[in-house]
């Protein structure tokens, strides 16, 4: 399989900032004594993401006996390119970003994150609380909607797949915009800058708990079926013994340990393979973002 060329061009642009940052870090991703880690935009800002996830990566590096660098990306697409290009050795990434990377030659997923004890989450569509939407998507036709960046599973791929599988093109059906972060989507709906937006349940919960939005600021009008949670993925060419150690270390994290090294609600990992993300890959093919190479 290969990624549609138009999508590649857009995704590569999202990786440039990360590539520059990694270059500044010095060294090479293949250095035996240093591993380069990256994490996608799981918090409102890269700084917050890095702070929240550094304890996990620090512990991983210590148990592997290596030093490490850590970068937090500004979008989901950029981390996929970074892993594919070998700038990153181990990445905590969204399911769609992982599938993009895998289909461009990156290595496999070795673990799937558990959130509140479950290895699944859900895409959602949120709306202004004053909107009367009882039937989706019918009652949303013609309204303003903000999708996340094209590397996002819940913010772009899954809602696009769901709509297109019903014969609807979101770019025509709505007043469409894409490219926002999930946090920006929640804020935009809360502030009335858009009528509708995509998000995922974990992010909305985290923003409510942090006080970034109130529970009444937005309302959920659509929820997807279960989706596999974030992947811990390794680059192609990483020593298989190191990849196995990464898997063993992260899947050994207990619920108690998770409370000290992982952000709230994350409770550890299960061992994983690429097969666990097949439904994401199938959705990518269905919307034309991934094509069979025949």
Specify the residue positions occupied by each region the protein language model found:
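Ligand-binding clefts/hinges and TM-proximal coupling segments of bilobed small-molecule sensing domains
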Residues: 67, 146-162, 248-294
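Bacterial N-terminal signal peptides
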Residues: 13-25
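Sec/Tat signal peptide C-region and signal peptidase I cleavage site
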Residues: 27-31
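A ligand-binding cleft/hinge motif common to bilobed small-molecule-binding domains
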Residues: 95-105, 162-165, 190, 195-215
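Periplasmic-binding protein-like
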Residues: 38-42, 115-124, 212-250, 264-279
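Bilobed "Venus flytrap"/periplasmic-binding protein-like clamshell domains
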Residues: 37-59, 63, 96, 119-186, ...
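Short helices/loops that flank or line small-molecule/ion binding pockets
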Residues: 77-91, 104, 138, 182-202
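Short beta-strand-to-loop elements that line the ligand-binding cleft
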Residues: 67-74, 172-181, 219-222
């Amino acid at each position: 399989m290969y990624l549609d060329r138009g999508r590649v061009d857009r995704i590569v642009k999202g990786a440039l900032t990360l590539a520059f940052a990694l270059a500044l870090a010095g060294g090479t991703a293949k250095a035996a004594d240093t591993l380069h880690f990256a994490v996608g935009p799981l918090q409102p800002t890269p700084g917050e993401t890095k702070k929240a996830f550094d304890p996990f990566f620090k512990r991983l590096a210590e148990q592997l006996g290596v030093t490490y660098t850590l970068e937090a990306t500004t979008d989901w697409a950029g981390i996929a390119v970074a892993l594919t290009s070998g700038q990153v050795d181990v990445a905590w990434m969204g399911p769609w970003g992982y599938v993009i990377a895998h289909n461009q030659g990156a290595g496999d997923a070795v673990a799937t994150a558990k959130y509140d004890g479950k290895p699944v989450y859900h895409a959602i569509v949120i709306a202004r609380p004053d909107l009367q939407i009882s039937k989706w998507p019918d009652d949303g036709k013609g309204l303003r909607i903000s999708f996340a960046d094209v590397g996002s599973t819940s913010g772009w791929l899954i809602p696009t797949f769901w709509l297109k599988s019903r014969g609807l093109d979101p770019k025509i059906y709505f007043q469409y915009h894409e490219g926002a972060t999930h946090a920006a989507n929640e804020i935009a709906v809360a502030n009335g800058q858009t009528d509708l937006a995509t998000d995922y349940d974990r992010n909305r919960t985290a923003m409510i708990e942090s006080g970034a939005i109130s529970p009444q600021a937005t309302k959920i009008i659509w929820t997807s079926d279960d989706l596999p949670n974030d992947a811990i993925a390794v680059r192609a060419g990483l020593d298989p013994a190191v990849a196995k150690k990464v898997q063993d270390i992260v899947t050994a994290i207990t619920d108690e340990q998770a409370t000290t090294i992982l952000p709230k609600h994350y409770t550890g990992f299960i061992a994983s393979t690429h097969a666990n993300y097949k439904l994401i890959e199938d959705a990518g093919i269905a919307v034309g973002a991934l094509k069979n190479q025949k």
